[in-house]
Protein backbone atom coordinates (compact mmCIF):
# COMPACT_ATOMS: atom_id res chain seq x y z
CA UNK A 1 0.00 0.00 0.00
CA UNK A 2 1.16 3.53 -0.74
CA UNK A 3 2.50 5.24 2.36
CA UNK A 4 4.41 8.37 3.34
CA UNK A 5 7.55 6.29 3.92
CA UNK A 6 7.24 4.71 0.46
CA UNK A 7 6.99 8.14 -1.15
CA UNK A 8 10.11 9.34 0.66
CA UNK A 9 12.05 6.21 -0.24
CA UNK A 10 11.05 6.43 -3.89
CA UNK A 11 12.75 9.76 -4.43
CA UNK A 12 9.82 11.15 -6.38
CA UNK A 13 9.97 14.73 -7.59
CA UNK A 14 6.18 15.02 -7.73
CA UNK A 15 3.06 12.95 -7.32
CA UNK A 16 0.14 12.95 -9.75
CA UNK A 17 -3.10 11.28 -8.69
CA UNK A 18 -6.59 10.67 -10.01
CA UNK A 19 -9.31 8.43 -8.65
CA UNK A 20 -12.04 8.30 -6.01
CA UNK A 21 -12.29 11.15 -3.52
CA UNK A 22 -11.21 9.23 -0.37
CA UNK A 23 -8.06 8.05 -2.15
CA UNK A 24 -7.21 11.54 -3.38
CA UNK A 25 -7.63 12.94 0.11
CA UNK A 26 -5.22 10.31 1.43
CA UNK A 27 -2.63 10.92 -1.32
CA UNK A 28 -2.76 14.68 -0.69
CA UNK A 29 -2.16 14.15 3.00
CA UNK A 30 0.83 11.81 2.73
CA UNK A 31 2.45 13.69 -0.17
CA UNK A 32 2.28 17.02 1.64
CA UNK A 33 3.54 15.39 4.83
CA UNK A 34 6.49 13.99 2.87
CA UNK A 35 7.19 17.41 1.36
CA UNK A 36 6.59 16.21 -2.20
CA UNK A 37 4.62 18.41 -4.64
CA UNK A 38 1.28 16.79 -5.41
CA UNK A 39 -1.06 17.44 -8.34
CA UNK A 40 -4.53 16.02 -8.33
CA UNK A 41 -6.94 15.55 -11.23
CA UNK A 42 -10.40 16.42 -10.01
CA UNK A 43 -13.55 15.02 -11.56
CA UNK A 44 -16.97 16.54 -11.04
CA UNK A 45 -20.33 16.21 -12.75
CA UNK A 46 -20.84 18.74 -15.51
CA UNK A 47 -23.48 19.52 -18.12
CA UNK A 48 -21.71 21.72 -20.67
CA UNK A 49 -17.92 21.28 -20.55
CA UNK A 50 -17.61 24.95 -21.55
CA UNK A 51 -17.47 26.58 -18.14
CA UNK A 52 -21.05 27.82 -18.38
CA UNK A 53 -23.20 25.52 -16.24
CA UNK A 54 -20.91 25.76 -13.18
CA UNK A 55 -21.91 22.22 -12.27
CA UNK A 56 -18.27 21.12 -12.04
CA UNK A 57 -17.28 23.89 -9.62
CA UNK A 58 -15.18 22.79 -6.65
CA UNK A 59 -14.34 24.82 -3.54
CA UNK A 60 -10.64 25.59 -2.96
CA UNK A 61 -8.60 27.84 -0.69
CA UNK A 62 -8.35 30.22 -3.65
CA UNK A 63 -12.10 30.31 -4.18
CA UNK A 64 -14.32 28.41 -6.57
CA UNK A 65 -12.66 26.63 -9.50
CA UNK A 66 -14.24 25.00 -12.54
CA UNK A 67 -12.85 21.55 -13.29
CA UNK A 68 -13.50 21.89 -17.02
CA UNK A 69 -11.81 25.27 -17.50
CA UNK A 70 -9.54 25.91 -14.50
CA UNK A 71 -8.43 22.29 -14.22
CA UNK A 72 -8.91 19.41 -14.10
CA UNK A 73 -5.43 19.19 -12.51
CA UNK A 74 -4.87 21.31 -9.39
CA UNK A 75 -2.08 21.82 -6.88
CA UNK A 76 -3.14 19.72 -3.90
CA UNK A 77 -2.33 22.59 -1.52
CA UNK A 78 -5.43 24.53 -2.59
CA UNK A 79 -7.79 21.56 -2.51
CA UNK A 80 -10.20 20.96 0.35
CA UNK A 81 -11.58 17.48 0.85
CA UNK A 82 -14.50 16.61 3.13
CA UNK A 83 -13.78 14.44 6.10
CA UNK A 84 -14.27 10.77 5.23
CA UNK A 85 -17.49 9.21 6.43
CA UNK A 86 -17.56 5.51 7.20
CA UNK A 87 -20.40 3.45 5.82
CA UNK A 88 -22.55 1.84 8.50
CA UNK A 89 -21.54 -1.71 9.23
CA UNK A 90 -23.61 -4.33 7.46
CA UNK A 91 -25.49 -6.63 9.75
CA UNK A 92 -25.09 -10.32 9.12
CA UNK A 93 -28.35 -11.92 8.01
CA UNK A 94 -29.55 -14.99 9.78
CA UNK A 95 -31.68 -16.67 7.13
CA UNK A 96 -34.19 -14.85 4.94
CA UNK A 97 -34.93 -11.30 6.15
CA UNK A 98 -38.49 -10.37 7.07
CA UNK A 99 -39.63 -7.82 4.48
CA UNK A 100 -43.25 -7.77 5.56
CA UNK A 101 -45.05 -4.51 6.29
CA UNK A 102 -48.44 -3.60 7.72
CA UNK A 103 -51.10 -1.27 6.36
CA UNK A 104 -53.74 -0.97 9.03
CA UNK A 105 -54.28 -4.49 10.31
CA UNK A 106 -53.33 -6.13 7.01
CA UNK A 107 -49.83 -7.51 6.56
CA UNK A 108 -48.11 -7.57 3.16
CA UNK A 109 -45.27 -10.06 2.77
CA UNK A 110 -43.03 -7.47 1.12
CA UNK A 111 -43.21 -3.74 0.34
CA UNK A 112 -43.63 -4.00 -3.46
CA UNK A 113 -47.09 -3.25 -4.85
CA UNK A 114 -48.30 -3.30 -8.46
CA UNK A 115 -49.83 0.14 -8.98
CA UNK A 116 -53.43 0.66 -10.02
CA UNK A 117 -54.05 0.86 -13.74
CA UNK A 118 -50.86 -0.93 -14.71
CA UNK A 119 -51.50 -4.52 -13.63
CA UNK A 120 -55.14 -5.02 -14.59
CA UNK A 121 -56.87 -7.29 -12.10
CA UNK A 122 -53.73 -9.29 -11.39
CA UNK A 123 -54.46 -12.22 -13.68
CA UNK A 124 -53.60 -10.70 -17.05
CA UNK A 125 -49.84 -11.04 -16.50
CA UNK A 126 -50.05 -14.65 -15.31
CA UNK A 127 -48.34 -16.00 -18.44
CA UNK A 128 -45.21 -13.89 -17.89
CA UNK A 129 -45.10 -13.06 -14.18
CA UNK A 130 -46.18 -14.64 -10.91
CA UNK A 131 -48.19 -11.93 -9.16
CA UNK A 132 -47.91 -13.93 -5.96
CA UNK A 133 -44.36 -12.66 -5.57
CA UNK A 134 -45.65 -9.15 -4.93
CA UNK A 135 -46.66 -7.70 -1.59
CA UNK A 136 -49.91 -6.48 -3.10
CA UNK A 137 -51.76 -5.78 -6.33
CA UNK A 138 -53.94 -2.70 -6.75
CA UNK A 139 -56.86 -3.20 -9.12
CA UNK A 140 -57.72 -0.97 -12.03
CA UNK A 141 -59.53 2.17 -10.96
CA UNK A 142 -63.10 1.17 -10.13
CA UNK A 143 -66.17 3.37 -10.34
CA UNK A 144 -69.72 2.72 -9.22
CA UNK A 145 -70.88 2.54 -12.83
CA UNK A 146 -69.08 0.92 -15.77
CA UNK A 147 -67.06 3.34 -17.91
CA UNK A 148 -65.85 3.07 -21.49
CA UNK A 149 -63.02 5.53 -21.00
CA UNK A 150 -61.69 8.26 -23.24
CA UNK A 151 -61.87 8.44 -27.02
CA UNK A 152 -58.90 9.04 -29.31
CA UNK A 153 -55.25 8.33 -28.62
CA UNK A 154 -54.69 6.93 -25.14
CA UNK A 155 -50.93 6.46 -24.91
CA UNK A 156 -48.05 8.67 -26.02
CA UNK A 157 -44.39 7.88 -25.38
CA UNK A 158 -41.90 10.55 -24.38
CA UNK A 159 -38.10 10.23 -24.22
CA UNK A 160 -38.31 9.56 -20.49
CA UNK A 161 -41.79 8.31 -19.72
CA UNK A 162 -45.30 7.57 -20.88
CA UNK A 163 -48.39 9.75 -21.12
CA UNK A 164 -51.80 8.16 -20.72
CA UNK A 165 -55.41 9.16 -21.15
CA UNK A 166 -57.35 5.98 -20.42
CA UNK A 167 -60.25 7.69 -18.70
CA UNK A 168 -60.83 5.10 -15.97
CA UNK A 169 -62.25 2.50 -18.33
CA UNK A 170 -63.53 -0.26 -16.07
CA UNK A 171 -66.45 -2.71 -15.77
CA UNK A 172 -67.90 -1.11 -12.63
CA UNK A 173 -67.72 -2.19 -9.00
CA UNK A 174 -70.59 -4.70 -9.18
CA UNK A 175 -68.92 -6.57 -12.05
CA UNK A 176 -65.59 -6.44 -10.22
CA UNK A 177 -67.12 -7.97 -7.10
CA UNK A 178 -68.84 -10.77 -8.99
CA UNK A 179 -66.18 -11.71 -11.54
CA UNK A 180 -62.75 -10.13 -10.96
CA UNK A 181 -62.39 -10.09 -7.19
CA UNK A 182 -62.82 -13.87 -6.73
CA UNK A 183 -59.90 -14.47 -9.11
CA UNK A 184 -57.74 -11.77 -7.52
CA UNK A 185 -58.28 -13.28 -4.08
CA UNK A 186 -56.86 -16.58 -5.36
CA UNK A 187 -53.50 -14.92 -5.99
CA UNK A 188 -50.98 -15.39 -3.20
CA UNK A 189 -50.79 -11.69 -2.46
CA UNK A 190 -52.89 -8.90 -0.94
CA UNK A 191 -55.66 -7.52 -3.15
CA UNK A 192 -56.19 -3.75 -3.06
CA UNK A 193 -59.37 -2.33 -4.61
CA UNK A 194 -58.80 1.10 -6.13
CA UNK A 195 -61.95 3.19 -5.65
CA UNK A 196 -62.57 6.18 -7.91
CA UNK A 197 -65.57 8.48 -8.21
CA UNK A 198 -66.91 11.74 -9.56
CA UNK A 199 -69.25 12.68 -6.72
CA UNK A 200 -69.23 12.15 -2.99
CA UNK A 201 -72.23 9.85 -3.35
CA UNK A 202 -70.47 7.56 -5.84
CA UNK A 203 -67.42 7.33 -3.58
CA UNK A 204 -69.55 6.44 -0.58
CA UNK A 205 -71.77 3.93 -2.38
CA UNK A 206 -68.73 2.27 -3.93
CA UNK A 207 -67.05 1.99 -0.54
CA UNK A 208 -70.18 0.45 0.96
CA UNK A 209 -70.20 -2.25 -1.72
CA UNK A 210 -66.50 -3.02 -1.30
CA UNK A 211 -66.84 -3.09 2.48
CA UNK A 212 -69.16 -6.09 2.20
CA UNK A 213 -66.56 -8.12 0.30
CA UNK A 214 -63.41 -9.99 1.30
CA UNK A 215 -61.11 -7.42 -0.32
CA UNK A 216 -58.45 -6.67 2.32
CA UNK A 217 -57.63 -3.02 1.51
CA UNK A 218 -59.33 -0.12 -0.27
CA UNK A 219 -57.30 2.53 -2.08
CA UNK A 220 -59.23 5.79 -2.36
CA UNK A 221 -58.19 7.70 -5.47
CA UNK A 222 -58.81 11.40 -4.81
CA UNK A 223 -57.17 12.43 -8.08
CA UNK A 224 -60.58 12.02 -9.71
CA UNK A 225 -62.48 15.13 -10.92
CA UNK A 226 -65.06 16.53 -8.49
CA UNK A 227 -68.09 17.30 -10.64
CA UNK A 228 -69.55 19.63 -8.00
CA UNK A 229 -66.32 21.65 -7.96
CA UNK A 230 -66.15 22.22 -11.71
CA UNK A 231 -64.01 19.18 -12.43
CA UNK A 232 -61.08 19.93 -10.11
CA UNK A 233 -59.64 16.80 -8.51
CA UNK A 234 -60.93 15.96 -5.02
CA UNK A 235 -57.39 16.04 -3.72
CA UNK A 236 -56.62 19.58 -4.90
CA UNK A 237 -57.79 21.23 -1.68
CA UNK A 238 -57.55 20.26 1.98
CA UNK A 239 -61.29 20.76 2.50
CA UNK A 240 -62.43 18.54 -0.37
CA UNK A 241 -59.87 15.86 0.40
CA UNK A 242 -60.87 15.84 4.06
CA UNK A 243 -64.54 15.52 3.12
CA UNK A 244 -64.00 12.63 0.71
CA UNK A 245 -61.83 10.66 3.12
CA UNK A 246 -64.08 11.32 6.12
CA UNK A 247 -67.24 10.20 4.31
CA UNK A 248 -65.63 7.02 2.94
CA UNK A 249 -64.01 6.27 6.29
CA UNK A 250 -67.45 6.41 7.90
CA UNK A 251 -68.79 3.53 5.79
CA UNK A 252 -65.88 1.08 5.87
CA UNK A 253 -63.64 -0.42 8.52
CA UNK A 254 -61.16 -1.77 5.99
CA UNK A 255 -57.66 -0.27 5.86
CA UNK A 256 -57.80 2.82 3.66
CA UNK A 257 -54.93 3.99 1.46
CA UNK A 258 -55.54 7.48 0.08
CA UNK A 259 -53.98 8.10 -3.33
CA UNK A 260 -53.06 11.79 -3.55
CA UNK A 261 -52.73 14.01 -6.59
CA UNK A 262 -49.28 15.59 -7.00
CA UNK A 263 -50.94 18.64 -8.55
CA UNK A 264 -52.28 19.86 -5.18
CA UNK A 265 -50.90 23.36 -4.42
CA UNK A 266 -50.62 22.52 -0.71
CA UNK A 267 -49.59 18.89 -1.04
CA UNK A 268 -48.48 18.27 2.53
CA UNK A 269 -51.53 20.12 3.81
CA UNK A 270 -53.77 17.75 1.85
CA UNK A 271 -51.77 14.77 3.13
CA UNK A 272 -52.22 15.82 6.76
CA UNK A 273 -55.92 16.52 6.16
CA UNK A 274 -56.35 12.96 4.87
CA UNK A 275 -54.63 11.57 7.95
CA UNK A 276 -56.90 13.60 10.23
CA UNK A 277 -59.91 12.20 8.36
CA UNK A 278 -58.96 8.57 8.83
CA UNK A 279 -56.44 7.51 6.18
CA UNK A 280 -54.44 4.44 7.20
CA UNK A 281 -51.76 5.09 4.56
CA UNK A 282 -50.93 7.57 1.80
CA UNK A 283 -50.02 6.75 -1.80
CA UNK A 284 -47.73 9.49 -3.08
CA UNK A 285 -46.62 10.11 -6.65
CA UNK A 286 -49.72 9.49 -8.77
CA UNK A 287 -49.51 10.52 -12.44
CA UNK A 288 -48.46 14.09 -13.07
CA UNK A 289 -50.40 16.07 -15.66
CA UNK A 290 -48.94 16.95 -19.03
CA UNK A 291 -49.93 18.07 -22.52
CA UNK A 292 -48.60 16.78 -25.84
CA UNK A 293 -49.11 18.51 -29.20
CA UNK A 294 -49.03 16.70 -32.54
CA UNK A 295 -46.91 19.12 -34.59
CA UNK A 296 -47.90 17.45 -37.87
CA UNK A 297 -51.61 18.10 -37.29
CA UNK A 298 -51.21 21.16 -35.12
CA UNK A 299 -53.59 19.86 -32.45
CA UNK A 300 -53.27 18.28 -29.00
CA UNK A 301 -52.51 14.56 -29.08
CA UNK A 302 -55.24 13.69 -26.60
CA UNK A 303 -58.94 14.40 -26.98
CA UNK A 304 -59.01 15.49 -23.32
CA UNK A 305 -55.97 17.74 -23.91
CA UNK A 306 -54.33 16.92 -20.56
CA UNK A 307 -53.02 13.46 -19.77
CA UNK A 308 -51.29 11.62 -16.97
CA UNK A 309 -47.50 11.38 -17.16
CA UNK A 310 -45.37 8.77 -15.44
CA UNK A 311 -42.00 7.11 -15.78
CA UNK A 312 -38.37 7.80 -14.81
CA UNK A 313 -38.65 11.56 -15.41
CA UNK A 314 -41.04 12.06 -12.49
CA UNK A 315 -39.03 10.15 -9.88
CA UNK A 316 -37.06 13.09 -8.40
CA UNK A 317 -40.31 15.04 -7.99
CA UNK A 318 -42.03 12.06 -6.38
CA UNK A 319 -39.08 11.58 -4.02
CA UNK A 320 -39.43 15.23 -3.00
CA UNK A 321 -43.14 14.78 -2.26
CA UNK A 322 -42.42 11.71 -0.15
CA UNK A 323 -39.63 13.51 1.70
CA UNK A 324 -41.74 16.59 2.41
CA UNK A 325 -44.73 14.55 3.54
CA UNK A 326 -42.61 12.41 5.85
CA UNK A 327 -41.10 15.57 7.35
CA UNK A 328 -44.58 17.12 7.74
CA UNK A 329 -45.75 14.02 9.62
CA UNK A 330 -43.09 14.66 12.25
CA UNK A 331 -45.45 17.33 13.58
CA UNK A 332 -47.88 14.55 14.51
CA UNK A 333 -47.61 12.30 17.55
CA UNK A 334 -45.95 9.00 16.53
CA UNK A 335 -49.18 7.02 16.91
CA UNK A 336 -50.94 9.30 14.38
CA UNK A 337 -48.37 8.94 11.61
CA UNK A 338 -49.22 6.63 8.72
CA UNK A 339 -47.21 4.62 6.18
CA UNK A 340 -46.34 6.10 2.79
CA UNK A 341 -46.60 4.05 -0.40
CA UNK A 342 -44.25 5.75 -2.87
CA UNK A 343 -45.05 5.71 -6.59
CA UNK A 344 -43.27 7.39 -9.46
CA UNK A 345 -40.65 6.22 -11.94
CA UNK A 346 -39.37 3.13 -10.13
CA UNK A 347 -37.32 0.99 -12.51
CA UNK A 348 -34.92 -0.95 -10.28
CA UNK A 349 -34.33 -1.87 -6.67
CA UNK A 350 -32.08 1.13 -6.09
CA UNK A 351 -35.02 3.42 -6.92
CA UNK A 352 -37.16 1.64 -4.34
CA UNK A 353 -34.44 1.99 -1.70
CA UNK A 354 -34.19 5.72 -2.47
CA UNK A 355 -37.91 6.16 -1.79
CA UNK A 356 -37.68 4.13 1.41
CA UNK A 357 -34.75 6.24 2.60
CA UNK A 358 -36.85 9.34 1.86
CA UNK A 359 -39.58 8.08 4.19
CA UNK A 360 -41.70 5.50 2.37
CA UNK A 361 -42.66 2.15 3.88
CA UNK A 362 -43.70 0.56 0.57
CA UNK A 363 -43.35 1.26 -3.15
CA UNK A 364 -45.68 0.97 -6.11
CA UNK A 365 -44.38 0.01 -9.55
CA UNK A 366 -46.45 1.28 -12.45
CA UNK A 367 -45.17 2.50 -15.83
CA UNK A 368 -42.10 0.27 -15.75
CA UNK A 369 -44.33 -2.80 -15.74
CA UNK A 370 -45.17 -1.99 -19.36
CA UNK A 371 -41.47 -1.86 -20.26
CA UNK A 372 -40.46 -5.02 -18.45
CA UNK A 373 -43.18 -7.12 -16.78
Give each language-model segment a name.
Residues 53-55, 123-129, 201-212, 264-277, ...:
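Catalytic cores of alpha/beta
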Residues 1-92:
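Reductase modules of NAD(P)H-dependent flavoproteins
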Residues 162-163, 170, 224-240, 270, ...:
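Glycine/Thr-rich beta-alpha phosphate-binding loop at enzyme active sites
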Residues 73-83, 149-160, 293-306, 368-373:
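C-terminal helical cap(s) of enzyme catalytic domains, especially alpha/beta-barrels
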Residues 93-191, 196-204, 373:
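N-terminal capping/small domains of soluble enzymes
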Residues 20, 138-144, 222-224, 281-292, ...:
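Glycine-rich phosphate-binding active-site loops on the catalytic face of alpha/beta enzymes
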Residues 119, 194-197, 260-266, 335-350:
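Glycine-rich beta-to-alpha transition loops that act as phosphate-gripper elements at the mouths
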Residues 68, 87-96, 309-337, 347-373:
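Alpha/beta catalytic cores of nucleotide-metabolism and tRNA/nucleoside-modifying enzymes
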